[in-house]
Amino acid sequence: MTNIRKTHPLIKIVNHSFIDLPTPSNISAWWNFGSLLGLCLIIQILTGLFLAMHYTSDTMTAFSSVTHICRDVNYGWLIRYIHANGASMFFICLYLHVGRGLYYGSYTYFETWNIGVILLFTIMATAFMGYVLPWGQMSFWGATVITNLLSAIPYIGTDLVEWIWGGFSVDKATLTRFFAFHFILPFIVTALVMVHLLFLHETGSNNPSGLISDSDKVPFHPYFTIKDILGALLLTLSLFLLVLFSPDLLGDPDNYTPANPLNTPPHIKPEWYFLFAYAILRSIPNKLGGVLALVFSILILMLFPILHMSKQRGMMFRPLSQCLFWILAADLFTLTWIGGQPVEHPFIIIGQTASILYFTIILIILPLVSMLENKLLKW
């Protein structure tokens, strides 16, 4: 008798995705982040669901409903901080996952990569709208500043911003619709994740060597289920250390002040995981130019398959490209730091230099170095 997991129409899908999936035997811990992102998504949806049971999306009561969750709801403070810091963990895993894809040339799987970039955009939109919901000072002013960027679009900009706001400023209508979108988008993300996995399993996983691994594959279970469980335990441990010891470490103190349209905070800045893009936005004096640079800083990921000039897939055997990759990583850390600093000397010039370096490395230097490596290796 054949095993039910191989014959049952539903269980068969799970079996082919997580149990009998042929997996390259040499994939390293960098391949753990896919499953960790799945775990983060589950944590965020569950905690978000419980928060939504007590939250009210009204400008008069939103801030106090969050206070009520933290003070009066059983373990409400825990659920709220797991959700807030879970978002930070989500983005740490996301950026490491993308970095792994860039380093090992996983972007040569076009469909998987492009769906991944769309996923990144969707998750960023979800996180931005979630940050607005507590209706603190930084929520309100962050929403005002970021949505206002759309007014840079020629001709339709102002009308578009007022349409998104549902009025002439960020108010009740804006908060209500942001809550609605923040609730529905994670389910759209889940659907996109399934499409992402569908395309990945069409080709099979990449591996550190970048070579075809058909001759050396092992079943996903038990080898990589155990490995993923270890990763999940480490992620959960670090999340709970953050939540229970310093839950406000990554937040902004301004968000503990209720939103006040008449009082602007001295430094308006988004959450830490958007600071690199915010720094790129601020480094261009022109409003439309800044918005285009902001969008292109993420959209540029879609160009990697086109810009890939190397005869080798990953960077494992390409020391010059490795150096460039780590310079790019350091540049992103610099941009993140600059995004949190006030707009004054010397931060302005550092931000502008780091922004130029970011685009130059990706668009010009990396393809040229790849071609040089081909010549050096006589390929």
Swiss-Prot record:
It comes from the Eukaryota. Heme b b562 binds at H83, H182. Its cofactor is heme b. GO terms for biological process: mitochondrial electron transport, ubiquinol to cytochrome c. It is found in: Mitochondrion inner membrane. It is a multi-pass membrane protein. Component of the ubiquinol-cytochrome c reductase complex (complex III or cytochrome b-c1 complex) that is part of the mitochondrial respiratory chain. The b-c1 complex mediates electron transfer from ubiquinol to cytochrome c. Contributes to the generation of a proton gradient across the mitochondrial membrane that is then used for ATP synthesis. Heme 1 (or BL or b562) is low-potential and absorbs at about 562 nm, and heme 2 (or BH or b566) is high-potential and absorbs at about 566 nm. The cytochrome bc1 complex contains 11 subunits: 3 respiratory subunits (MT-CYB, CYC1 and UQCRFS1), 2 core proteins (UQCRC1 and UQCRC2) and 6 low-molecular weight proteins (UQCRH/QCR6, UQCRB/QCR7, UQCRQ/QCR8, UQCR10/QCR9, UQCR11/QCR10 and a cleavage product of UQCRFS1). This cytochrome bc1 complex then forms a dimer. Belongs to the cytochrome b family. This is Cytochrome b. It comes from Petaurista philippensis (Indian giant flying squirrel). The gene is MT-CYB.
